[in-house]
Amino acid sequence: MILKSFLLGNLVSLCMKIINSVVVVGLYYGFLTTFSIGPSYLFLLRAHIMEEGEEGTEKKVSATTGFITGQLIMFISIYYAPLHLALGRPHTITVLALPYLLFHFFCNTHKHFFDYGSTNRNSMRNLSIQCVFLNNLIFQLFNHFILPSSMLARLVNIFMFQCNNKIIFVTSSFVGWIIGHIILMKSIGLLVVWIRKNRSIRKYIRSNKSFVSELANSMSIAGILNILLFVTCVYYLGRMPLPIINKKLNNLEKMDQAKLKNNTPLSYIYKNQEDLYLEILGKKDKEKSFSLFEKPILTFFFDYNRWNRPLRYIRKINKNLSVRKETSQYFFYTCQSDGKKRISFTYPPSLSTFGEMIARRISLSTLEKLSADALYTEWLYTNKEKNNNLNNEFINRIEALETVFLSINILDTKTRLCNVETEKKKNCLVNKKNYLVKMDDPFLTGMYRGRINKLFSSSIINQISIENYEKTYELNKIHYNLLPYPNSREYEHKIDPNSPDYEQKIEKLEKIQAQIDLNNRFIFLWTTIIAKLKGQKNSSRINEIGKKPPRWSYKLINELHQNYKKRRKEQGIIQGLRHQLRTRKYKHIYFLNRSTRTLETLKQSNLNNSNMDKKFNNKDLGFISYLEEPDFRRSLIKGSMRAQRRKLVIWGPYQGNPHSPLFLEKKQDFPFPISDLIKLFLNIKDRLGKKSEFEILNKQSPPKRNNQEDVMEFWETIPHGHKTRGILLLAQSTFRKYIKLPLLIIAKNIVRILLRQSPEWDEDFQDWNREIYLKCSSNGLQFSKTKFPKNWLRGGFQIKILYPFHLKPWHRSKLRLYDSDRDLKQQEDFDSCFLTVLGMETEHPFGPPRKTPSFFEPIFKDIDYKVEIRKLNFRVRRIFKKIKKKEAKAFFFIKQKIKELLKGNKIPLFLPREIYESSETQTEKDSIISNQIIHESLSQIRSTGWTNYSQAEEEMKHRIDRRKTIRNEIEIMKKNKINNAESSQKILKILKIKNIELLVKFFIEKIYIEIFLCIINMRRIPLQLFIQSTKKIIDNDKYINNNETNQERINKTKQNKIDFILSMTIKRAFDNLRNSKRKSDIFFDLSYLSQKYVFFKLSQTQIINFNKLRSILQYNGPSFCLKTEIKDFFGRQGIFHSELRHNKLPNYGMNPWKNWLRGHYQYDLSQITSSRLIPQKWRNRINQCQTSQNKDLNKWYSSEKDQLLDSKKKQNSKVYLLPNKEDNLKKNYRYDLLSYKYIHSETKKNYYIYRSSLETNNNQENSTRNKEKFFSILKNIPSKNYLGKSDIIYMEKNKDRKFLYKINKNIKVEPNKDQIKDKNKDQKKDKIHNNGLFYLPIDSNLEINYKKVFFDWMGMNEKILILNCLISNPKVFFFPKFVRLYHKYKEKPWFIPSKLLLFNLNITSNFSENQNINGKQEEYFLKQEEYFLKQEEDFLKQEEDFLKQEEDFLKQEEDFLKQEEDFFKFRPSNSKQYFELNNQNNIEEYFLESTEKLKIFLKGDFPLQLRWAGRVNQLNQKIMNNIQIYGLLLSLINVRKITISYIQRKEMDLGIMSRNLNLTQLMKTGILILEPARLSLKNDGQFFMYQIISISLVHKSKYQSNQRYQKQENVAKNIDKKNSDLLVPEKILSSRRRRELRILISFNLNLKNNTGVDRNTLVYNENKIKKMESIFG
């Protein structure tokens, strides 16, 4: 048994019981209610954040208790009905809570109201605590605003219907809410702590530090909370409509006087009907006046029937009001269903209220409820009885069918409606029945089925009544519906037929029934008679109970209905109604304007018509057109909340069209339409692809939309579109009429006068006066000249021009016949038009502009006409000449013929000629024409007497035959021509198709060529192309610089051919690239400067050997090989002079770069740098990712022979390496070593990778230096752009680099050396050699007196010690030899690369060249270690002294706090009295000193930030907070109010403010650290290149000497003269690209001549060449 209890099923059931228990469910719902946060949390958080001390803890406790009690009241209100009604009734919370909230907000904004600062405890303590308690208690009763529907809070109320143990449920839900509240508060605290500790979030907070500090100082936390409270007030007012200030909706339609007169009953008591009408109106007014006061006060202020939600209003045509759809159609009540008690949601509410009323009056004994089992058994019993009855009836019918006699009850019969007609058939009357269709028969269809009372005989009635009365019947229908379980057998009664009183009871019932029938008949007759007499309907005696649908108390109308009722003013409706529904934007379009003139003419014509006034009212007939645009306000009711509107959701920041949330997924949110791209692709495919010979259009093209509609919609969619269009039309009309046309007339007539023609002033101005401007509606309906149409600014209007004026070149007095018809047609076409906004003419309103008759067209036509006449005259003359020639020939021919005829027989001249010819000639002609003629004999033809007749007949036959033959031949020719034409057409089609294919191929090839050309000219050209193109140019062109500046060039003896074509193509590519960059914005990032471009520019400007181009460039005539643009380009760049005066190459060390700088003068603008500030972190991030760092900077200037083998130094640099891949680094170095040994195997010299040495003259001139030109002053270069204060900051920088400038006892921080000034300008300067771009000369002389120097600039002083440098930074303690370099880097970080701190440095010394500098450095650092150990002991002593000073500070703070309290207690209102009470002189002196210090402090530039040193652990954070507050107070104007607020909130501590402590003391003690403000400038690649080259050319810096440096002149004189590094293309490339460059160069080395250059014997020196190395070696 014990094991059975531990079965799985029992455990599951136990768990389910626990989960479904009241306690667990209450805990669950209570826990959920914590997430429905209300405004009370603001007060709770305010108390927990702001309050401190004892009073703060009390306020926290009061806030939490008030918060908990408020929530407890809310839970109790669920169980306790009065509280629930008080808190849940509509508008009670808004009436009570909102005024309190607003009062609290406006009162709490005052700074001294319920102040949470330092106040007297006895005065305000109790009241403030009570106010905190009340705030948290009252605001807990408000609605929740984070979850607007408050669903989580309402779940508790919903569960109360199902819960029986209500008290347990309330307590458990309250406990669950407390648990959730505790978890929520703890999670908020942990979140705040996590934000403070997390650095990734703190950096975002620090980035907005200035904004946060300004916000904190401008307003307190209490002010922020007050703003949040005000937002909640607005939120509450926004979510619910204002209960008092609402729109009064008018629902009464007042009838007009005429209607009331017609509807009043006629009576002869009053002589005048108007008196009766006035009396009726007076009664109605009285009723209205009293009805206002009869309304209750709540309904007067709060109208619950008005429209709060923006629901759709469905207007009824009839007079009934619209049905309210927002009321619930469901009413929940218990009823019996299937033998069990269930909740019905369609129970009639009236029946439930009636049942409750009866249940109160009926005794409790009758209302006893049966158990569920008894009720179910009763239901089963009744169902069995019904089943048995049906079975018995069915069996009885089956048995009756077996019998012979048919009874009535065997089958179910149905009656049908029919029409009986009698017909005579064979002397017999036959009844014919015509039945209705089943669909139309009311007896068969369900809805229209009626009941027919069957008339039976008395015997049948008695028999049926007896049978019915024997059956069961119910006592009362009310018991069935309302009393419990009326179907039970207790309420059933039967009459026993065997009882002795059976017959008596039936007789009584029959008598009662007969009396009832008589009474019913009498009542029916009486009611019908009275109804007929009174004209009323028959009132049925059965009152049907029906449910009236809930209707709105207002009848709302829209704007259209309002305008319609305004127009029906004469028909009985008054104009006072206003619309409440917003309709879609529309406008009236009129197509018939019935003016007063037309009405008068119609009335005169129809004098007999008396109804003319009614038929033809002075109205404009038209229709309404809606605009095709989205409308958010459509069908909205005024006063409803748009934010709660359904089906239209605003889901984006800007939404032009209303969208339903159901269709958001189908909406395409792509930035470009895909359909347009598909269409474009298909069009290109159709153009390029093959087309069929005959294109068949299967698809019908969609009809094009009218342009007028588009223009109309355009002006309607624009805000105030019609207004602007109307003003423009008026302006164009006045401009056209009075300015444009008169000027044209004047200009035309002046030209005619100049051409000596008569002017046409009168004719032109007559045409100008004919032009008339009419104002029309938007659709072109005419109005008049002066009057505008109604609402012409909103709906728009048109200007119609009648007889528009067109300038003509001349006016004809009499028109010709052919010109008159043409001019009449033109006048009909241009009789009227409409004016456009641009001053043009259109035929239709909003139509396209039409062509106007041109002024010059008739002139050109006249000229063409005259030219054609002249041509005709010329042609006619030629024709007449030809005719004359032919006539002369013909006349001569006729003469000859006449002579011939006169010589022969005399034949009549006018007879036919062929008759008298011989037969032989005739047969010859006939044989020529055809062979089908039948030849007759001469005997037959020459019959006597008929000779003339026979010859004529024969001639006719002959002609007929010839015509036939000619026709046959013509038909044959036509057939041949048709065949030839078809074949030629086929050939032409084939040729066309082939031509199209060839054109398409040519077009595609052209596109491919352009694409490949674009790809070739892209910016990302491979680097090998540049290396190969410049390899032959760079090959063996090496220069040797002498100490003199005007050094001659060393020419080569053996010149190689230049690949000039390749270099020109590269040059063009880069010209295109440079032009594209010039067109774009000049301010771009340094990271976009490619190495390829820099390499090309350097190789182009320096290393080209111009001896190869001497013959081309030196030729002054027209060159066939080289363009003049290339010569000009070389001349502008300063690389090669166009005249070639110097036969030698320019100096490699100095002149080429100066000339290049002169050519790039466009970067010589210092104003550009001011406009390139961009965010600092972004710049650092991009530059950090894109800058390439050199691996082997530790190998600079070392005297080792083979620096590549130093593997220890290689391991220090791990650039471009991924983790766990150090083997790649070793492989790269081995490959470098192998390649360099192979390249320089024959030269046997120690070629260094990153060094190109050149000897230069170290002597430089002495000159004064101006401010802010430390890097830009070059010799013989007019440079205005310089690296000033703004440029030094970003010279060297990493992502998280911080420049910490410490102001210590013996160290000076200088942001720029330009601040050094010297009065003696002619003194000698200290020589500093710029051996490289970032070369750092370090003086190794250690015997300098540093005690007298306060600011040690780059002095490397041994005795200078930084406080706490060993303890605060343990890395420095273990590596003391780097301390000196580390602090020197902090002094001047913008000039020294960060990697030079850990690598070998070039230390100038007095030793000889052969001594090892690294060995001296090691000895020096060993001495430094000993020295630091001694200084450590001194530092510990100084630290003890500092702790003592700190204790003194704390004592001073306590004293100052006491003085502060006395100051605020006894401070008088007037400041002058205060000065009189104390020592006036001392205070005035103190304030004067402080003001002077402030002025001096504000005048200076402080691009630095203050910080405490990390070693001061005992100082409180309040010191730093005070310093921040002081800095903010300095920048404010009204300092007094803000300082008082800081002191009241205890954010400013007055004890720390001591008068004796100065900034200089803090600097001497080393407490403060200065951090510079970081700026960021954006420069392009050319600008950086310009600056770098300008720096590298400064051989000797023109510094002015300090006294300390004047003592070291002897040391400076002995400084070694060393070769300076020149910036060559090799250094700009990356390490891998350098390797490729050197390998390619090595293949073209001339090993026989190691120097690779032609030597000039005048300059050549072998001793010097031994010290040289190749430029790229």
From Swiss-Prot:
The chain crosses the membrane at residues 18-38, 67-87, 90-110, 127-147, 175-195, 218-238. The gene is TIC214. It comes from the Eukaryota. The lineage of its organism: Eukaryota, Viridiplantae, Streptophyta, Embryophyta, Tracheophyta. GO terms for biological process: protein transport. InterPro entries: TIC214. Belongs to the TIC214 family. This is Protein TIC 214. It holds the Pfam family Ycf1. Keywords: Chloroplast, Membrane, Plastid, Plastid inner membrane, Protein transport, Transmembrane, Transmembrane helix, Transport. GO terms for cellular component: chloroplast inner membrane. Its main location: plastid. It comes from Lactuca sativa (Garden lettuce). It is a multi-pass membrane protein. Part of the Tic complex. Involved in protein precursor import into chloroplasts. May be part of an intermediate translocation complex acting as a protein-conducting channel at the inner envelope.
